[in-house]
Amino acid sequence: MGRRYFKSLVYGPVFSNLGLLVFYEIFKFLEEALERHKDSLIGDLLIPGMARTIALESDLAHYLGEEWQKDYVMREEVSDYLKHLNQLEESDPYLLCPYVYHLYMGLFSGGQVLKAKRMLSLSSIAGLKEDDDGGEKPGYSVTNYGDVPIGSLKRQLKKAMNELAENLDEETREQMLVQSAKVFEMNNVIIGSVKGVDR
């Protein structure tokens, strides 16, 4: 996942039109799944302040217009990803946990650095700059966690994931390891569908 995952969310039209859009459905599904299973150990992974669905919708509305969903057609690669997640939830919801962990940890770890790089990149292209009052520029909600420290989110998610794994049987833990590798494969597929991202 690494560099390509982060890059797909950052630069120019890839960020505004494609990077956000292909991952929007994935984050939305995972957050809805966490809510569906909130009364189990899985629910512990939904750390307060972590959810990104509303932020993604805000950014997409900024870049694509308020009625962006009217003409939105899901990419086949994204549809396949969602089918895979649905199958996992039906067979064993705990197998969704590696997707939650890796996707959000990736956003936590790289989001702030890439936010700064994106600002520099877009300012050189379109003359964008931070608001005079120091406020958040519209379109950057996905990397804005407000007053919630990124380090705290990372520690809480890691702790919740470790505690969850400790309470599962060996077979389930092994299956989760398999899905941990699958996360990178699935992400690379949808990233590869985004034009302008190095393959």
What positions do the PLM features span?
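Metal- and O2-centered redox machinery and metal/ROS homeostasis
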Residues: M1-R199
